[in-house]
Amino acid sequence: VEVVLRTPASLALLQAIKDELPDMVVGAGTITNASILAEAIAHGAQFIITPTITPTLLTALADCPVPVVPGVSNMSDILLATEFGYTELKLFPASLSGGAPFLKAVNAVLPQLRFCPTGGVSSSNQADYLALPNVIAVGGTWVANSDWVKAKNWRAITDACVLAQQENHI
């Protein structure tokens, strides 16, 4: 599970999940600089996901002790990430970065790359992404929308996850 670091409580949540569910693989998302990266690692993140990249951030990630999935939104980002050795990337925001047609075009010239699109991925378009040979996963909040979380409607979240699996033959 990815804990996005967007609130002051996020790091404590990451640590609490690690403490309460030690077998769960928990990572940190929305990593944007070296200090946030260090805090995420100190709180037990087992993988790192960034929303975007800069040369400075990629340099900080080079020494990261856990797997990293850097975020990209265009061909320049993609090529910069590959210069640092990355072949598995997050496309964010996918819907504003060209979506499935963009990833199809990228596959024609860089078939060795794999993507996890997020941002604008929904139950109505997830299959379009997952049908592409260079998409290994998708991410989206439709499976755990904020209303369900606030209401502690775990059944609705479970049902949405099961439906996503069934629709995509996972």
Predicted regions and their residues:
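Glycine-rich phosphate-binding active-site loops on the catalytic face of alpha/beta enzymes
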Residues: 47-57, 90-99, 134-156
